[in-house]
Amino acid sequence: MAEAPASPAPLSPLEVELDPEFEPQSRPRSCTWPLQRPELQASPAKPSGETAADSMIPEEEDDEDDEDGGGRAGSAMAIGGGGGSGTLGSGLLLEDSARVLAPGGQDPGSGPATAAGGLSGGTQALLQPQQPLPPPQPGAAGGSGQPRKCSSRRNAWGNLSYADLITRAIESSPDKRLTLSQIYEWMVRCVPYFKDKGDSNSSAGWKNSIRHNLSLHSRFMRVQNEGTGKSSWWIINPDGGKSGKAPRRRAVSMDNSNKYTKSRGRAAKKKAALQTAPESADDSPSQLSKWPGSPTSRSSDELDAWTDFRSRTNSNASTVSGRLSPIMASTELDEVQDDDAPLSPMLYSSSASLSPSVSKPCTVELPRLTDMAGTMNLNDGLTENLMDDLLDNITLPPSQPSPTGGLMQRSSSFPYTTKGSGLGSPTSSFNSTVFGPSSLNSLRQSPMQTIQENKPATFSSMSHYGNQTLQDLLTSDSLSHSDVMMTQSDPLMSQASTAVSAQNSRRNVMLRNDPMMSFAAQPNQGSLVNQNLLHHQHQTQGALGGSRALSNSVSNMGLSESSSLGSAKHQQQSPVSQSMQTLSDSLSGSSLYSTSANLPVMGHEKFPSDLDLDMFNGSLECDMESIIRSELMDADGLDFNFDSLISTQNVVGLNVGNFTGAKQASSQSWVPG
């Protein structure tokens, strides 16, 4: 203890050496040094009364300790030149030795000897003049209460947090409530740290912290002020945590919002219900998969994709008008797939009847069928029993054979599209039936194109042409009842047109093409079955309406969906007989039906509702090749070969029984797909 009076002289050089960058007081707060509290109490042993201020961290000392810090900085400038890095390092080593010895409870007097003995020779020589530093530690240890109290402050103003200060401010008010501005005023008035920080420049930081704590902690509640234009009151939440930090309020976001979760769940349920409803109401997909050679039996995913596509476009909003051209409607295919088209026909309808999809029930169309029955234009009349049988066939399950395959004959201006469950069809559907008057005066060929994966299509045709205006066709006395079949081919759903034209006769024709599902019938229903080994085509002919017997050679026929426009425009030039062939996955050919008195008539003599028949007053000349090249090839990049090929192979004779007319042969050119 005798060395205590001499301690101030050697202490100041040591403190100067430590102050510039290695001040011991900053280490506990920065958590970079495991500095013990006893060593903090021992190191700032100065005879002056500023021990408490010296033990503080510089940022906490603030303005009150500026004078002391300035004095130490001045002394550092005065002595810094003679110190050097070696002296600074020796001071640091001495501090480490003091830290090791002080917590161990050793005698302070033995500290310097131990520290000096444990150091190297060069460093020990530097520490010799500074060894009198540790003896004053007992004097500092006696008054260690104040330094400990000051150095344990959490914030610059003390141990209280912002939330604690706000709580005290609110509790100190008579009404136990304060506005935000009143809280600011209380801070400046009652907390010494904020006394000189009330102006706008220096108060931005701590005022923002107060606002943050008010919103963060659940112990504070905001109450609406009764007066208009006044800020809200902040009160202490009686249910909130009074001590410590309350749980934070989570901001409402897309992840934790219950409302969003519920709405998302409802949307998912609605979507699932919409998807399951068409599947349960109709077994058309199962019918499609039962076809052994059908392209739809390969992948149910493609069928599902087409089902979703048709459900999206099954509305008037998806079409411009009821008389939309098939060329324009074909652009809808591009929305679904670019490489492969959906395995379904493109269905067209007038504005009075939406285009139904294969995946939807057929019961909705029943009233419309009944209504349309009264507007049919029949040459020799269609009996009510036959119509009743036809309507009854709509609800037949796939396992039941169709009792009658009667064709529904009606005027040419209305195409009717039904669903995949089939109109009088056990395994397929009447996808489109268009009946129109036609003239039987001449024989006309028209190439019926079928699109298959951008492959060149070659069309075989017959050699008779005729020039007849649309007006003549419309006003013709001889009517032929023809039907158009929506057929399914592999790359594109081809729209096929089969001709069953008759004068003074009714007949029932059942046609079944494997990739094309139209007017399918069981093989035992007809009198003639022409089966292709590759496609399993069953085309049968039902009983005739009289004693007439029609023996037709039936084979595949397919049209692309866009061929209806081209063929309709050819009809304006009076196409009477057409020969076509389909390029699908397997072989395809052409079919020719003839019940005319003089010439066999092709069934594509129809006028779909796509054509505005009111605008034609005279003859209309159309160039089929230019139409296809401009509208079809430009859109899809298809390659067509219009070389007329008349092949003599696979020639099937067409026999017309009980009819006054010449027999004609239809030639079929089988081209591998």
Curated annotation (Swiss-Prot):
Q: Which GO terms describe its cellular component?
A: chromatin; cytoplasm; cytosol; mitochondrial matrix; mitochondrial outer membrane; nucleoplasm; nucleus; protein-containing complex
Identify the residue span(s) of motif Nuclear localization signal: 242-259
Biological-process GO terms, alphabetical: antral ovarian follicle growth; brain morphogenesis; canonical Wnt signaling pathway; cellular response to amyloid-beta; cellular response to corticosterone stimulus; cellular response to glucose starvation; cellular response to glucose stimulus; cellular response to hypoxia
Q: How is it modified after translation?
A: In the presence of survival factors such as IGF1, phosphorylated on Thr-32 and Ser-253 by AKT1/PKB. This phosphorylated form then interacts with 14-3-3 proteins and is retained in the cytoplasm. Survival factor withdrawal induces dephosphorylation and promotes translocation to the nucleus where the dephosphorylated protein induces transcription of target genes and triggers apoptosis. Although AKT1/PKB doesn't appear to phosphorylate Ser-315 directly, it may activate other kinases that trigger phosphorylation at this residue.
Q: Which PROSITE patterns match?
A: FORK_HEAD_2, FORK_HEAD_3
Composition bias, Acidic residues: 57-68
Effect listed in the UniProt record for changing residue 245 to A: Decreases DNA affinity
User: What would changing residue 32 to A do, according to UniProt?
Assistant: Abolishes YWHAZ-binding. Exclusively nuclear, induces transcription and promotes apoptosis
Modification type Phosphothreonine: residues: 32, 179
Region ranges (Disordered): 1-153, 231-302, 536-587
Biased composition range(s): Polar residues: 283-298, 549-582
Q: What is its main location?
A: cytoplasm
Q: Where is this region: Required for mitochondrial import?
A: 80-108
Effect seen on changing residue 242 to A:
Slightly decreases DNA affinity
Q: Which residues carry this modification: N6-methyllysine?
A: 46, 149, 230, 262, 271, 290, 419
> What is known about the tissue distribution of this protein?
Ubiquitous.
- PTM annotation (N6-acetyllysine): residues: 242
Protein's cellular compartments = Cytoplasm, Cytosol; Nucleus; Mitochondrion matrix; Mitochondrion outer membrane
Specify the effect of residue 179 to A.
Decreased phosphorylation by AMPK and impaired ability to transactivate a reporter gene
Q: Which UniProt keywords apply?
A: Acetylation, Activator, Apoptosis, Chromosomal rearrangement, Cytoplasm, DNA-binding, Membrane, Methylation, Mitochondrion, Mitochondrion outer membrane, Nucleus, Phosphoprotein, Proto-oncogene, Transcription, Transcription regulation, Ubl conjugation
> Looking at the UniProt feature table, which residue ranges are given for the DNA-binding region?
157-251
Positions with biased composition (Basic residues): 261-272
PANTHER family associated with the record: FORKHEAD BOX PROTEIN O (PTHR45767), FORKHEAD BOX PROTEIN O3-RELATED (PTHR45767:SF4)
Quaternary structure note:
Upon metabolic stress, forms a complex composed of FOXO3, SIRT3 and mitochondrial RNA polymerase POLRMT; the complex is recruited to mtDNA in a SIRT3-dependent manner. Also forms a complex composed of FOXO3, SIRT3, TFAM and POLRMT. Interacts with SIRT2; the interaction occurs independently of SIRT2 deacetylase activity. Interacts with YWHAB/14-3-3-beta and YWHAZ/14-3-3-zeta, which are required for cytosolic sequestration. Upon oxidative stress, interacts with STK4/MST1, which disrupts interaction with YWHAB/14-3-3-beta and leads to nuclear translocation. Interacts with PIM1.
Q: What is this protein called?
A: Forkhead box protein O3
| Source organism (scientific name) | Homo sapiens
What gene does the UniProt entry assign to this protein? FOXO3
